[in-house]
Amino acid sequence: MSDLKCPFSGHTGAVTPAGNTNNGDWWPNQINLGILHQHHPASNPLGDAFDYPTAFASLDYSALKADLQTLMTDSQDWWPADWGHYGALFIRLAWHSAGTYRTGDGRGGAGHGNQRFAPLNSWPDNTNLDKARRLLWPIKRKYGNAISWADLIILSGNVALESMGFRTFGFAGGREDIWQPEEDVFWGKETGWLKDERRNDKGELNQPLAAVEMGLIYVNPEGPHGEPDPVASGRDVRETFARMGMTVEETVALVAGGHTFGKCHGAAPDSHLEAEPEGAALHEQGLGWRNTYESGKGEHTITSGIEGAWKPNPTRWDQGYFQMMFTYEWELTKSPAGAWQWTAKDVKPEHMIPDAHVAGKSSAPIMTTADLSLRHDAIMEPVARRFHLDQEAFADAFARAWFKLTHRDLGPRALYLGPDVPEEVQIWQDPVPPVTHPLIDEAEISTLKQQILASGQSVSALVAAAWGSASTFRGSDRRGGANGGRIRLLPQRTWEVNDPEQLNGVLTALETIQSQFNSSSSNGKSVSIADLIVLGGCAAVEKAAADGGHTVVVPFRPGRSDAGPEQTDTASFNVLKPLADGFRNWQRSGLPLRAEELLVDRAQLLTLSAPEMTVLLAGLRVMGANTAGNRQGVFTQNVGVLSNDFCVNLLDMTTRWTPTSEAQDAYIGRDSATGAERWSASRADLVFGSNSQLRAIVEVYAQNDGGSRFVADFVKAWVKVMELDRFDLRS
């Protein structure tokens, strides 16, 4: 039997398909284009016609919340609730779903229900959250597709808080589920759980990571690398929460608010835990961490390894967390599982905490090292003291921070669904003013395009400005984009990648055109700079195509508005500043990643396919949209003309490419017969001739019949990028 091979995988015996070598094993430096095509519609069992906002509108929202409220105290024998209340479990479920978000690239977070899949469903920090999702299954089954898993997980956390006496800030639905693991998220290079190989020479976390160890949401609760040092832990806490966009006040509120409820579980060493869900046996049916200690549940539960509750009344909202923290001195102890924790000394009888499962048993309050960082960190301690003395301020701060935590990656308010959406607008939502005037029509659009082209700005400058405005969009957290016209504001106006001097010329010309149009309009119509920036790019593309012999009309839909400085958090928008933009052949110096990897990463954030990435880069090159007039990759003698010259000349076998340095990040292309220099290129250019998949796409456009297809496909991809943030057009 050992000689028999599976006809599909080629494997013998019991070897798993994962043991098969793939292209990445043979050629580890090969770029991963698969991230551009993940979440293909074919993977979605709901089909292309399913519209989640429509389905959500049919939801009996009040009934759903009532069922969740009932669930909170409906303790199940197979996984008993602590103190008869599941509230803390569902707070942790929601928190750990949202808490993977990081501002560096907008990835992670609660927006897609990715906690259902590897690796998150099997992270050590998510131990036993598989049980929480199974507890939710009867409710998910009842309401079906009217509520996504992603929304249900977050809503369960909100209802949990409300069921224990806390008033939340609100809830918005709109998170659509994915149906396979995300391949684009870099969680770290470590090959073992709870390892830390993610810091630079200064000890700072490498970008875009926001957790201190592989498999953790934030910090090690026992302290950095398991060392119980509250001061050092404070630095980790502040850094990790800042990496997900939280202020110090929000950080303190979240830690204290979340730990107002429930307990830690460390009844015995984790050697009693069997494999996590992804590694568990088939018959476990997706459940992991089977516990062989005693009953394996209830008072015998093992999760973090820390054991105990933070305060009396663990199922009620109150000031107990801060009261315990600042009332008592804390003694370093070890849990039954061997984890470092801190136990209150000389506890008053009224502060002893009844056991979650065993009648007549009680324990002193505990704190983790991370908890005590709120008391010992010089920056967080004053905030914690203030919250201790002002319950109203603490409650308000926690409500707002919880809403921000659980909604940060949902996108703009235009995507919010449901009756509990708060009316108050938050600056972290990147608000744009509503459009309150009639929009320009086709005739006016045509006139404005003529005026823009006659303004003295080149095709290259107009295209670059429009691209710089729209390409800040990130499909990960739906931030950025052209709406709001923030490229005219700080910080974007001064970003090196946007070629500030050239950009200022474009903006000045467009502002003059805007002023003339708006002041002369007799029908109440106005046009925003945000619209004019995009329209200028569209007009330039039309001219570039016409100069190449192709008559095209680039679709343009007005309706963008101009945000002001008061609606723009400069620090928050600085995280959108690209490390590299291969589409403009620009890269910050000193980056460890190769230009082609950064290009694919940026294309994925722009939700582009490999063909879309190819045609856009090739078109932008020949139109001269590189930053600061960089000539790398401009494989044409007719700069400013939209043509397939990049593709044709890249595949020219009479050009011989050689690197110009040992780093092999820049190249010269010479005539193979004469040695005369023809072109210069970056890695982001030559990858389209080197990578077999990208070369196959380039060949389509370089063919004699590929010119018209190239222009048509460029226009289609261009419009897609210009409208990535136009969620108002889809509602």
From Swiss-Prot:
Task: State its Enzyme Commission number(s).
Answer: 1.11.1.21
The task this protein performs is described as: Bifunctional enzyme with both catalase and broad-spectrum peroxidase activity.
Protein name, as recorded: Catalase-peroxidase
Q: Where is this cross-link: Tryptophyl-tyrosyl-methioninium (Tyr-Met) (with W-95)?
A: 218-244
Question: What would you give as a GO molecular function for this chain, any one?
Answer: heme binding
Q: Where is the active site?
A: 96
What is annotated about its quaternary structure and interactions?
Answer: Homodimer or homotetramer.
Where along the sequence does the record put site: Transition state stabilizer? 92
Which GO cellular component does the record give, naming just one?
cytosol
What does the UniProt cofactor note say?
A: Binds 1 heme b (iron(II)-protoporphyrin IX) group per dimer.
What is the source species? Synechococcus sp. (strain WH7803)
User: Which residues lie within the region annotated Disordered?
Assistant: 1-23
**Record lineage:** Bacteria, Bacillati, Cyanobacteriota, Cyanophyceae, Synechococcales
Q: At what sequence positions does the UniProt record place the cross-link Tryptophyl-tyrosyl-methioninium (Trp-Tyr) (with M-244)?
A: 95-218
Q: Which cofactor does it need?
A: heme b
Picking any one GO biological process from the record gives: hydrogen peroxide catabolic process
Pfam families for the chain:
peroxidase
Respond yes or no to whether keyword Oxidoreductase is given for this record. Answer: yes
Q: How is it modified after translation?
A: Formation of the three residue Trp-Tyr-Met cross-link is important for the catalase, but not the peroxidase activity of the enzyme.
Q: Which UniProt keywords apply?
A: Heme, Hydrogen peroxide, Iron, Metal-binding, Oxidoreductase, Peroxidase
Q: Look up the domain of life of the source.
A: Bacteria
Instruction: Identify the CDD domains for this entry.
Output: catalase_peroxidase_1, catalase_peroxidase_2
The record's catalysed reaction(s) read:
H2O2 + AH2 = A + 2 H2O; 2 H2O2 = O2 + 2 H2O
Annotated binding of heme b, by residue: 259
